[in-house]
């Protein structure tokens, strides 16, 4: 297990949440907010992808253990901490998640016309949660990330989905929640 002096994996995981904060601070009329929200989300997700590529370039596929391990205290009184790292299985999924998010933002550039800021917030939150799911080495942290992915997905499907979006969102949420409760 290789630990790093700079918490690159934690920064990669939570960088999209910094974008969420910027999105929440955007003011102006609806057109200005929509345009700026798209741009901020694209830039933040693009930078997250570039950071994941840097992580991939520095990843040693010949090393069998976890790399870029970040440890920290979370609930010290209960002895619960968090631990994040990558191995040969999780690394491609992190890069894939970081790659697909800007593509999804670009794909929705013209199709999402209402509540654009909220849509971009949901996507950046989803990116944080996906990367966190693949990077978590602690069972509690993994479970929290894994379950929390349901929230932005429910919102995205329920608000910007197709004709039966509300039905689909509830069905997705309930089936996924029921399947993961056994974990």
Q: At which residue positions do the language-model features occur?
A:
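Hydrophobic transmembrane alpha-helices of multi-pass small-molecule transporters
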Residues: 20, 49-52, 105, 131, ...
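Structural signature of hydrophobic alpha-helical transmembrane segments
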Residues: 5-15, 86-97, 139-152
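Glycine-centered flexibility sites
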Residues: 19-20, 85-88, 158-161, 179
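Transmembrane helix-loop-helix hairpins at membrane boundaries of multipass inner-membrane proteins
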Residues: 1-8, 23-106, 110-121
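Short hydrophobic/aromatic segments of transmembrane alpha-helices and their interfaces
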Residues: 1-4, 14-15, 72-77, 122-126, ...
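Hydrophobic, membrane-inserted alpha-helices
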Residues: 19, 101-102, 125-130
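Hydrophobic membrane-targeting signal helices
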Residues: 13-14, 22, 55, 135, ...
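Alpha-helical multi-pass transmembrane bundles of energy-transducing inner-membrane proteins
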Residues: 29-37, 121-125, 129-183
């Amino acid at each position: 297990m290789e630990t790093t002096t700079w918490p690159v994996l934690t920064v990669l995981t939570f960088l999209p949440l910094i974008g969420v904060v910027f999105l929440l601070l955007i003011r102006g009329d609806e057109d200005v907010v929509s345009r700026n929200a798209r741009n901020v989300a694209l830039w933040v997700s693009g930078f997250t992808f570039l950071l994941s590529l840097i992580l991939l370039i520095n990843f040693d596929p010949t090393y069998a253990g976890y790399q870029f391990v970040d440890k920290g205290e979370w609930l010290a009184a209960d002895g619960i901490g968090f631990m994040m790292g990558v191995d040969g299985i999780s690394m491609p999924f992190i890069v894939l998640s970081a790659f697909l998010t800007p593509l999804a933002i670009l794909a929705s550039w013209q199709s999402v016309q209402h509540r654009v800021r909220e849509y971009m917030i949901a996507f950046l939150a989803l990116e944080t949660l996906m990367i966190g799911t693949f990077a978590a080495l602690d069972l509690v942290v993994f479970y929290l990330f894994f379950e929390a992915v349901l929230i932005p997905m429910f919102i995205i499907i329920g608000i910007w989905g197709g004709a039966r979006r509300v039905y689909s969102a509830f069905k997705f949420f309930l089936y996924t929640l029921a399947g993961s409760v056994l974990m």
